[in-house]
């Protein structure tokens, strides 16, 4: 096991929620780190007394802004009695990058406090933990979803109109599950960020500006970007700031949103149902952020031009059928919310690096086209 270097703790995480297992007195590993059986067994023993991992094999490693390891573990009798499976997925930030955001501690809290209260399908979590020193270090140990026999989504998969409609029914189930619920108020869940009220949201363009600049050097990206954006790339920053102000001023019921709602953050079960699997940007928010991001990103440009409004109406019907109340009318969603939230997708994908795991060029084409078709820039003062 490689030990991470020790460094002074920077206060990244302002929600100093006490760690769930106070018996763990050492910090979670960070920086470049490779777990082994001894480390995993010691960690899991905080929740499952007597558990030991006799051996552990790393089956697959995904390393981007988040580190995900599929592992095969041989547990002792205590582990088997606790129901721990052989195949697991460990997720944390051991990439050596992105240490200035709170996404890993937040995801751990989502799994510890909230996902079992959602009506939508989520991955089984066997362990979730975080440091409460402001460092935002977090770790989760999930089931290996490969064992469910489905497949992981990818941002460029062609789901088609029917596939997107099916996914929107699943998304409505997610949003309606804790719609306007007392469980997600600031008083009941002070650890839960409100959409567009935290730096990872409202400063996202500025945080990601380095990668936005890298894409601006790419001739393939420049070939599909609007000239007005290439002439003044800071337009995305100004427009996005106005989206932030618009959302903060809007008054409507809150729900739980995924926050980064594209096909690449889903797992498709054998029965076709979508499972929402990445909670690093989970929020108390309104559904239009998820809805716009998913539909514009999942549909081809021509599919969107012909079917977008009908799919939005379908989602709204599903949302109400699942129990949501005081839902704004379709015209307001279509004319006021969707065009503005396209800017969220534009700023997200202009900063995407393909080596993080999602192919950004088709997404940039789709969101840029939607921005022009729906007058998103104009609505946001650009």
Residue ranges and their predicted role:
Residues 149-258, 366, 371-382:
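ATP-dependent phospho-/nucleotidyl transfer catalytic cores
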Residues 62-80, 238-287:
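Active-site acidic catalytic loop and adjacent metal/ATP-binding pocket
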Residues 128-132, 181-196, 326-333:
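Short, glycine/acidic-rich hinge or "gate" loops at secondary-structure transitions
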Residues 109, 281, 287-324, 340-363, ...:
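Active-site activation/catalytic loop segments of kinase-like enzymes and analogous catalytic loops
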Residues 1-137, 245, 269-274:
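Conserved NTP-binding catalytic cores of kinases and kinase-like/nucleotidyltransferase enzymes
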Residues 140-148:
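Short pocket-lining segment of the protein kinase catalytic domain that shapes the ATP-binding cleft
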Residues 149, 153-158, 246-249, 261-262, ...:
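Flavin-dependent oxidoreductase catalytic core characteristic
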Residues 93-96, 152-157, 277, 293-301:
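Glycine- and acidic
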